[in-house]
Structure formats: structure tokens, C-alpha cells
Amino acid sequence: MGRQPLSCPFFFAVGLRPVAEEAEVRALVDFYDTVHLAEVVRLNEGFVSAARYELTEPLDDDSVPSLLAVYGIGSEDAARRFLDRQGERRPVYTPGPPLFYSAPVVWRMVWESAGSTGVDDLMPGKMAMIGMDPAADATEAEIAEFDDFYTRTHLPEIVSGLGYDRGTRFLLWHEFTHPEPGCPRYNAVYEAEDPNPRPPGVPPLSSGPRAWEERQVRWRVKYRRAA
């Protein structure tokens, strides 16, 4: 498949929280890996790649997906065509195992890339995602300061200080499904080719503007690449 999903200008995330017997979960992930991931790319014009991730932290939070599929979208036009195909115009996919239909869908949203540091493309073995909102009462000027600090200062500090190969800031482009009170506005994604965990500890980080310091972190999750 072409560029990796998180290297694309947009990506579509589908996150499930299957709770079932091990054999049922295995049937679900096997279906994703051997049939569904490639089929979604093939049947949606402008989709260029797909990958599946499994949650490593936190394992006990039912509001975040334990199985995450991400699909790279090559352009905004392709993303808009995808929105137009929702409902009755959605592609007809190969039927899956029972858990494919019964597993709770906790995430379903499209994200737009808004700035990156590090390598242009990679095959990540692991990634971290941090969903956040700026200070609730931030003005437009403060949001601009938040964005500038986020991209120019914080992303590079995390990438270099925590051993990631790339950090990318994504903006919520469209929300289909997310637990209340809704999806955060920003999603910082940090990727590393090495799947092994890094020793614990966070290096000193720069202080940011008020909208940054008073940000609300909605979720902080880590995944390993599974397919």
C-alpha cells in the first residue's frame, strides 16, 4: 500500500472495544488483517493505506479502543467523497465474524494533519496518541499561540526527548463516533519504528502560553502495531 496512514494529509480512525472469548477476538482480528483493511482501501477512492494497532496503555479504560484501525486518505477531496458515501451509499464489504458487528465502536473520526517533525514516512512499531483541547476560554489569538507552540516547540521536544521518530499534530476534521462529551479538537501522534518500550521518565519540557498550560488532556493512549 502507498504511504503509511499517519503520513497522509488525512486519516480515518475506527476504534473498537471487543469483549469476548479469545477465539472470537482472534477471528475478528484475523478478518481485519486478511480481508477488511485491504478491502476498505480498495473500495474507497482516495484511500491509500491501512494499519491495525492494539492498545498497550491504559488497558482498563473502556472509553478508548483496544483495537484501532487507521486508514490513510490522500487528499481533502477524497475525504469529502468519503463523507458523501456514508449511509446507503457506503460500499458493501465482505461479511465478517459475529464480533465484527457486535463489538462496541468507541472511535470513528477523520483527522487532518496540521504539522509534523521528524521523518517523512515510516513503518511504526508503536505510537502514542494524546487527545486534547486548549483552555476552554482561550481567544482566537491564544489559540494561534497554542498552535505555534505545539508545532514549533512541544512536538520536537517530545520526539527528541522520548526517542520517537516522528511527531504529528492532527486537527479533528470530522467526528462520527466518540464517547461524550465528544472528540477533542487536537490529536498529537508520536511514532517510533522500534516497538520496544522506552525506559520511563520525561525530560524537562518548555512552558507554553496560557492556552497550552491550561489545556485539557482528554485521553493519552499507547498502541503497538499489529498489522
Name these PLM-found stretches:
Residues 1-227:
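Macromolecular interaction modules
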